[in-house]
């Protein structure tokens, strides 16, 4: 039995999640809430500058979209509490707007009739469980929580990497820098922004700024609380980012042993190890959370380690959103099956 999902928001992540979810047999995309007409949404799903032409044909219809024989209802209401989730029997509302990332706001989807909510960004508070695949997804709890957060693209990259290093060698402390492609909260030309560096043109400069990844990491890896800190450098590329992680370990290691730990981690689809001398464009539309750049792994004094991990901050992250939605759906189905028996 497939899980009925609705997607709130058709920005970069919302559209990528839709592309992926439409090809997942365990998910049934029932509805989209967006402020644009069907023709605009269909065009932006079919044709994407970064990820290319979609391999399915999405067509606009009256008040909706059609993909083959499958129809998706299109609604437009800025207040999630007014959305027809109960009428449409929505199991999971995926909120990709970034505007309802506090549990007290996301609860509007539950009030509208959705069984669960999945946020495509870090939670800003409230009764929300943050879930990162390959880190704490085995603790996903649909009994205790109605609202879940898939954290950030950077947390999804650094989380599995830090967990492997900590489990195998023990992390004493460390610093991370994410070299991040531009995002739509930056300015194409100089304009006001609460972060004065992000107020500057994203196409002209390397822009130092903050990242919430280290803070979010403690929610999914509490054993590393207080041990990692970091910052971001926004660079003028349209997609694909990397994490530069430097840690002091409890054990002495070699670069080969570090790379082998990632190879043996058993996190297929989450961590990939790349031995070729590649550059960022080569990882565009890579579905993994983290791709270890094996040639860049360094060790100094036996226990100081540098690891470079690439990630497609759009496509890789959106794959994890779909993975978590699928996991929540499977747990809901299992619960309903038990209740019916």
From Swiss-Prot:
Assigned keywords, A-Z? Cytoplasm, Glycolysis, NAD, Nucleotide-binding, Oxidoreductase
Q: What class of enzyme is it?
A: oxidoreductase
Enzyme Commission number(s) of this protein: 1.2.1.12
Would you tell me the protein name for this molecule?
Answer: Glyceraldehyde-3-phosphate dehydrogenase 2
Reactions catalysed according to its record:
D-glyceraldehyde 3-phosphate + phosphate + NAD(+) = (2R)-3-phospho-glyceroyl phosphate + NADH + H(+)
Q: Which gene encodes it?
A: gapA2
Tell me where it mainly resides. Answer: cytoplasm
Organism this protein belongs to? Staphylococcus aureus (strain Mu50 / ATCC 700699)
GO cellular component terms listed in the entry, alphabetical order: cytoplasm
Q: In which pathway does it act?
A: Carbohydrate degradation; glycolysis; pyruvate from D-glyceraldehyde 3-phosphate: step 1/5
PANTHER family the UniProt entry points to: GLYCERALDEHYDE-3-PHOSPHATE DEHYDROGENASE 2 (PTHR43148)
Matching CDD domains: GAPDH_I_C, GAPDH_I_N
